[in-house]
Amino acid sequence: MAVKIRLKRMGAKNNPFYRVVVADARSPRDGRVIDEIGYYDPVKQPAAVVINEEKALDWLKKGAQLTETARALFRKAGVLQKFQQK
């Protein structure tokens, strides 16, 4: 089973809010998820990025792949550097 770390859109129209989730690569964007590991709120100034580092590193060690957007958020939060150091 291919597992990806990606964003799940939440919120209202014109007021998006995203959850950073671990999901099967074949499931729909807002479909069933395996685990929620954080959130991203682009509406706040500055944009809020909160990621549970312990869960994120655990999933990356298990082989979960990051989408481009999730990779940018992980880089911004400093999680990607910690994973590459280990």
Swiss-Prot record:
GO CC terms of this entry: cytoplasm; small ribosomal subunit
Pfam families according to UniProt: Ribosomal_S16
GO molecular function: structural constituent of ribosome
Signal peptide start and end residues: none
The keyword Secreted is annotated on this UniProt entry: no
Keywords assigned: Ribonucleoprotein, Ribosomal protein
Protein name: Small ribosomal subunit protein bS16
Species this protein is from: Carboxydothermus hydrogenoformans (strain ATCC BAA-161 / DSM 6008 / Z-2901)
